[in-house]
Regions:
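Disorder-to-helix initiation segments
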Residues: 220, 224, 228, 232-243, ...
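A structural-propensity feature for long, helix-poor, extended segments
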Residues: 264-310
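Conserved phosphate/anionic-ligand binding catalytic regions in large, soluble enzymes, centered on
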Residues: 231-258, 359-363
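Hydrophobic alpha-helical packing residues
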Residues: 1, 64, 133, 254, ...
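Amphipathic alpha-helical interface segments
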Residues: 41-43, 296-363
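Long, contiguous binding/interaction regions
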Residues: 1-222, 226, 233, 319, ...
Length: 363
C-alpha cells in the first residue's frame, strides 16, 4: 500500500522515518510523508546500426541486456515460451549486468538503434557496453556506426572510455583530459549523428560556475607572454611562489613529453605501458603544480585583504590580527606544498633521463 499503509510502515523495524520521527497522529494523517531516494548515475545511450530492421535491433538488445530473452522450446524465435513451476517465464540472461535495452527505428535518422539504459556504470561502464553491442551486432552481420548519449554523463564515463581505447591501441594515457575525452568521442562515434560537445553533455561542466573557474585559473589561462608581462608589472603578485609552481609544472611537462615519446617509439612497443605509467604520473604532478600557480597568488591576496581590514576599534584590531595570522599561515603552507609537489617531478625525469628515448635526454 501507499498512503493507507503509512501507519503500519512507520512502526516497522528499519522503516522508521530518518527525519521527523513521530507517531502517526492527526498531523501526519494530514500531511503524509515524503520519500526521497537516491541511486547511482544512469547513462542513457543509443547505438546506431547500419540497418532499418527493428527486429534485428531487438535481437541485439536481447543478446546484451541483463534480463535477456525468453527461453523457448525448439525454435529460439517462434518456439513455445518455457515456464517454470510457478508459471513464470524462464529467461536466458544477456551478457551485460545492470543494463536494460530494446531495439527501435528512429524516423528522424532513418536507422534502427539499440536503446540502452546502463543502471550500474560501475559494473558495466559505457565503453564495455559499447564493445559488447559491437560484438553482438557483428555476430548478426550488422555494424554499430556510432553512439548517441541521451541526456548527461559524468566526466569519468568519458575519461574511463578514452583511457580504455588508448590502452587497446597500446598508446600512452598520460595526456590531457581534453584529449582523452576526444578519443572517447571518436572511438564510440558520439558525433555520428550530431556534433558532441562535452561542455554540453558532461555533468561537471554544466554545474561548475565558469566565472568561478576563470577567477580560480586567472594566471594559468594567460598566454606565456601575458604571464611574463603580468609578473614583470608593478603588481606584487604573481611572485616567486607562482613562478616556482609554473617552473615545476613545465619540468613535469617535459618529463611527461619524453615518457609519451618513449611510449610510442618504434621498436619499443613492448615497453609502451611502462612509459604510459610514467606519463600518467607526470601529468598528475603537472596538474597539481598548475593549480598551485593561482593558489599561491590567491594566498598572497588573502594577506593583502587582511592588511586592508579596518582597525579603528579593539574588536576590529582583534579581527584584523586573527585574519592576518590565518592568511600568513596559509601563505606559508602553499609554497611548502609547491616544494613538496615539485619533488614528485624528480622520479619521472630521473627515469626518463636513464630509461627514456635517448634522443630526448636533453629535454
Amino acid at each position: 500500500g501507499e498512503y493507507e499503509a503509512l501507519p503500519e510502515k512507520m512502526t516497522k523495524e528499519g522503516a522508521q522515518p530518518d527525519f521527523g520521527a513521530r507517531p502517526f497522529d492527526e498531523g501526519v494523517a494530514r500531511t503524509g510523508a515524503t520519500a526521497v531516494g537516491a541511486r547511482d548515475f544512469l547513462v542513457a545511450v543509443n547505438y546506431n546500426l547500419n540497418t532499418t530492421s527493428t527486429r534485428r535491433a531487438n535481437a541485439i538488445a536481447f543478446d546484451v541486456r541483463e534480463k535477456g530473452r525468453p527461453k523457448r522450446e525448439g525454435n529460439p524465435i517462434t518456439g513455445k515460451i518455457v515456464k517454470d513451476e510457478n508459471g513464470k517465464t524462464v529467461m536466458i540472461p544477456g551478457t551485460l549486468k545492470g543494463c536494460k535495452a530494446i531495439g527501435w527505428f528512429i524516423d528522424e535518422y532513418g536507422i534502427a538503434q539499440v536503446s540502452m539504459n546502463i543502471t550500474d556504470i560501475n559494473t558495466t561502464p559505457l565503453h564495455v557496453a559499447f564493445d559488447e553491442v559491437c560484438r553482438a551486432a557483428q555476430a548478426r552481420g550488422l555494424r554499430v556506426t556510432g553512439t548517441e548519449i541521451v541526456g548527461l554523463v559524468p566526466k569519468r564515463t568519458l575519461i574511463e572510455a578514452g583511457r580504455y581505447f588508448l590502452e587497446k591501441q597500446q598508446r600512452s594515457t598520460g595526456i590531457s583530459e581534453e584529449e582523452i575525452m576526444k578519443i572517447a568521442v571518436k572511438s564510440m562515434g558520439l558525433d555520428d549523428l550530431k556534433p558532441f560537445n562535452p561542455k554540453e553533455k558532461v555533468v561537471e561542466f554544466l554545474i561548475e560556475d565558469e566565472k568561478d573557474v576563470a577567477a580560480r585559473e586567472r594566471l594559468v589561462r594567460m598566454t606565456c607572454k601575458g604571464f611574463a608581462y603580468e609578473t614583470a608589472s608593478e603588481s606584487p603578485a604573481p611572485g616567486g611562489g607562482s613562478i616556482s609552481a609554473y617552473m615545476g609544472a613545465l619540468g613535469a611537462a617535459l618529463g611527461t613529453m619524453v615518457a609519451n615519446l618513449s611510449s610510442h617509439k618504434a621498436g619499443w612497443d613492448a615497453r609502451w605501458k611502462e612509459f604510459s605509467d610514467w606519463a600518467d604520473n607526470g601529468q598528475a604532478v603537472m596538474n597539481k603544480l598548475l593549480a598551485l600557480v593561482d593558489e599561491d597568488t590567491a594566498a598572497f591576496d588573502k594577506i593583502m585583504a587582511a592588511i586592508g581590514m579596518p582597525k579603528g576599534s579593539e574588536e576590529e584590531k582583534a579581527a584584523r590580527a586573527a585574519a592576518l595570522e590565518a592568511a600568513t599561515l596559509y601563505a606559508t603552507e602553499v609554497p611548502l606544498k609547491t616544494m613538496k609537489t615539485a619533488m614528485e617531478v624528480f622520479p619521472v625525469v630521473r627515469a626518463m633521463a636513464s630509461e627514456g628515448n635517448p634522443n630526448s635526454v636533453s629535454d
